[in-house]
């Protein structure tokens, strides 16, 4: 509810949907840090109803420039397990969400930039009530030892050595300070500053350090990419192009329509949807990737004739 309230507040002040989305996401980074936050990335698909134009901003994380194909290999020649790799610095990409915020706000925002940060800053300083969702995550992470091993996460999620629980009041003054800096100076306060130095230090810390550099952060930019559209019955589905999986949505819709007919019952429709997902995801995993690095046969994959071949 905190994020929704922040978004509504922005809309009531005359902000755009983009303004509201940024404000909501900043709050989510506080109240649901396991799912959102400044250390990640995102995609934004924006529709301008006045011009009927769609634009796509790619603010996803990028691999550090020094990333190598064998970076997840251990010294003994074996590949790191999922649970070894995910908490390590090797799995951390150069964060893009702050650049996405700024790019989107410059293009589609209306309210002053600092105003978007107010609710998140106030909640960080004054505290928010821990939700069952966050408490459950901490419970699960505790079983894996993922929070208590890191001094900073232990301090935050185990104040006074007591694990947080649903209903507790939790404050995050460090997050408030970071947001204040970005609100005052813009994205440069995140990508070319002491904050950037702290990010690099954390990512490259033992026991499984990554290889992110200050140059990776300084050089990061959100990217405008094409919007892709495809037919579905008498409608048109428009979504995000690679590196997102938006194209798979169009493929799923087309495949689903090929697998059912007017006489299909609910069970058959569910089965068709599952099969459509399975087939589309197989192609996604095989063909999709970073369009700056690989050639993706997207036009062929989205061709309705391709669906008929199944």
Show which residues each predicted segment covers:
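Internal maturation/activation junctions in enzymes
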Residues: 260-310
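Generic recognition of well-ordered alpha-helical segments
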Residues: 6, 100, 178, 251, ...
